[in-house]
Regions:
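Active-site recognition of the HExxH zinc-binding catalytic motif
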Residues: 304-324, 339-340, 344
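Amphipathic alpha-helical assembly segments used for oligomerization, scaffolding, or translocation
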Residues: 12, 17-225
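Auxiliary, metal-adjacent structural segments of Zn-dependent hydrolase domains
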Residues: 221-286
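Pan-zinc metallopeptidase signature
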Residues: 207, 211, 374-383
Length: 383
């Protein structure tokens, strides 16, 4: 009769359980090892790839910025080169070996272990591609910077004279007057965006100043001016002239000596009885000068001609606000005639009285052409 050992079955069960536990422990150990290995591999590479992705994003943002400027075609070649470099980088970054490496799925990361050598090679190539992309982004942003600086150098002095409030124009001038250096292309892009925004704000202020100017001109032209000398006494004529300039935010300054732009004491041809100075520091922007030592001052001060003279000088100012200079290109050698036409057309100065008072002075003589040029300036065409 066979011997029956009741403990043998229990022993076998125990051994089976132990075996299963060992297998599970091995599997868990392998899984933990693979998880740690893949996580470590991804952790070592992710900061590098994030840096490269930052370079790529800056490149894309730089293209978008350049394409949004006034004349993006001038940057077309640079944009195309940056786009090519970005495409080169994207082809590498989109490789399946890199996607396996960075996947949140453990199974895919484990598969990625089979491509370790290829991953290293691709990542090395990505570094080169990102470096090239960063360099070409710098070329693009440098071209944008140069174009913006050129526009600034051509127009900043004009903008400063044109705007009613010079705060932002002075800020723009101050920023361009400083040496600018950047630690990264992202920093350079941020600064150029800021400069562009500031420049756009200043240009909008110029447009607003011109619009306000035209409204004020209409208000000044609406002020009634008596026709005869005896209608007002000298104080009355001066008060009327003051009311006209005040409408424009301007004041009259009486002086005994011609003094404009370093020409102190000089009165061209002895003709000037009133004048307006265009000074780069805006110090004379809102001032009209009356030369009380002019031989005809006593007579002028008792007549509506005083108001016409003031309107002529205000027209110099209006042309400056519109064009950034009292002598715009479109006026050519007819600055004074065009200014007279402007005073008649937009300030309501008396054409016949002006012609009579300036008879024989050819450069001041108005005609249809000077009227046409004055209208063009008022409409925003400075030549």
């Amino acid at each position: 009769m066979p011997y029956h050992n009741p403990n043998s079955r229990s022993r076998r069960n125990v051994l089976r359980i132990v075996g299963v536990l060992v297998v599970l422990a091995v599997i868990a150990g392998v899984a933990n090892f693979l998880h740690a290995t893949t996580s470590e591999a991804a952790g070592n590479v992710k900061p590098q790839i994030e840096t490269m992705q930052g370079i790529r994003q800056t490149a894309q943002d730089s293209i978008t910025f350049a394409q949004g400027l006034d004349d993006p075609d001038r940057f077309a070649a640079h944009i195309e080169t940056v786009q090519q470099c970005m495409d080169d980088y994207d082809r590498l970054a989109d490789a399946k070996q890199i996607k396996y490496l960075l996947s949140d799925n453990l199974q895919e990361r484990i598969i990625g272990l089979l491509y370790r050598n290829q991953q290293r090679t691709i990542i090395d190539s990505m570094r080169v591609a990102a470096h090239n992309l960063d360099g070409q982004t710098k070329e693009l942003l440098s071209a944008v910077d140069a174009a913006m600086a050129d526009d600034f150098s051509q127009h900043a002095a004009q903008w400063l004279l044109q705007v009613d409030d010079p705060t932002q124009a002075n800020e723009l001038i101050d920023r361009y007057g400083k040496q600018r250096a950047y630690a990264s292309m992202r920093e350079m892009l941020a600064d150029l965006r800021s400069l562009h925004k500031l420049r756009s704000d200043v240009k909008q202020q110029v447009s607003t100043a011109v619009s306000n100017l035209h409204n004020a001109e209409a208000a000044a032209a609406a002020i009634a001016v008596p026709e005869r000398n005896g209608d007002l006494d000298p104080a009355g004529w001066y008060t009327l002239a003051t009311n006209v300039v005040s409408t424009m935010g301007v004041q009259i300054e009486q002086t005994m000596e011609f003094n404009c732009g370093g020409q102190s004491g000089e009165n061209p041809s002895g003709f000037v009885a009133a004048y307006y100075c265009q000074m780069p520091d805006r110090s004379q922007r809102n001032v009209v000068h009356m030369l009380t030592t002019h031989p005809d001052w006593t007579q002028t001060a008792r007549s509506p001609w005083l108001v016409d003279m003031v309107k002529h000088e205000l027209s110099h100012r209006s042309i400056m606000v519109s064009c950034g200079t009292t002598q715009p290109t479109i006026a050519a050698d007819r600055t004074e005639a065009v200014t007279n036409s402007y005073s008649v057309l937009f300030f309501g100065a008396d054409r016949n009285r002006i012609a009579d008072q300036q008879q024989g002075v050819a450069e001041y003589a108005m005609d249809a052409h000077s009227d046409q040029l004055a209208t063009a300036i008022h409409d925003g065409n400075c030549g």
